Amino acid sequence: MTTKFLLSSDDNTRSGLLKKKIIHYYMANGDATIAEVCKEMNLSIPTVTKLISELQEDGYILDFGKQETSGGRKPSIYGLNPVSGYFVGVDILKDQLNLAILDFKGDKIRIEQNIPYTLENTPAALDHLCECINEFINSLPIPREKILSIGINISGRVNPFAGYSYSIFYFEEKPLSQILEEKLHIKIYIENDTRSMAYGEYLQGVVKGEKNILFINISWGLGIGIIIDGKVYFGKSGFSGEFGHFSFFENEILCHCGKKGCLETGASGSALYRTLLERYKEGSNTILASKIDAGEYIGLSDLIDAIQKEDMLSIEILEEIGFNLGKGIAGLMVRHFVISLTNIRNWSYWAAPCRRRENI
């Protein structure tokens, strides 16, 4: 099986590009006849027949037999061969990793979540990331050479086309994707985490079929993914979606981006954590008091757990964050938007303040 045309961004031959488009069509639409592919791609039947035949020879496409019809010649149905290749996905959070492997049709084979990991802008943290990915791959009943690529979600400013991350792991001149490829020996793609989530929601989520959406991701930080006319909007150098860094408050709180008063300073997981510490020091009570007193690490999962256990201080602050977020969203002129707040099951704590009349 040859994978050169599939993985190379330099293969600009007409045949290579059309083969990629055919594979993308089957990934998005499932099994289909040659006539259906021709109609969608505006290509002739001889051209598509030849390309699909070559993809069959390479092992990417299978012939699933004749389609049942009411009359006339029965066309063959073709679809992706699920075992022809695999893709690994890596989601990097502030204090954990989520890893998954999908077959060539996009079906999940295995998912491992909440793997302990500390995200830091250091070579040691990058090496630890590679160790975790290697351990996951080595545990799979799949030959390493059948993994076609690894997609890695990273927070902050990411240029997916050049392979650079400008917010984390930016201590070398080379693109981060190249550094990771040298360490893992597998093709690497990096992308902003919120943009990836937005695209996944567009393909399979509650807004499937809509062409224009905003995806708002509230985790330790705050960002948005933008879909315009069915396409991901990247902006200049891939820096679109920095919603959390609009100048919004007169609070003199220094954001990690270097500015003061960013929306993220009052509407994010880091804002929840900072405000919780401030209120506790002022005399408020919380079930996280013992951890605070002991100087233990408190991550987003600890804050979420406190909310689920109905810690009143955490809930009160979460409601304030919801109200702040609503004020920010009110300025976004869009018909459909999706809000993701990591693992919060009782949405009423923050959704109701977010949707107050004076906001939305």
Where would I find each of the regions flagged by the language model?
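ATP-binding/phosphotransfer module of carbohydrate and carboxylate kinases, centering on a glycine-rich
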Residues: M1-F64, T69-G72, I77-Q113, Y117-E145, ...
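Short, ordered coil/turn segments that flank beta-strands lining enzyme active or ligand-binding pockets
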Residues: V83, F104-K105, F161, I228-D229, ...
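Short glycine-aspartate micro-motif
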Residues: F87-D91, I147-G151, I213-N217, G223-G225
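Glycine-rich phosphate-binding loop and adjoining helix at the ATP-binding site
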Residues: I109-N212
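Conserved residues at the C-terminal ends of beta-strands
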Residues: N153, F249, S340
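Flexible loop residues that form catalytic
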Residues: S155, I218, T342
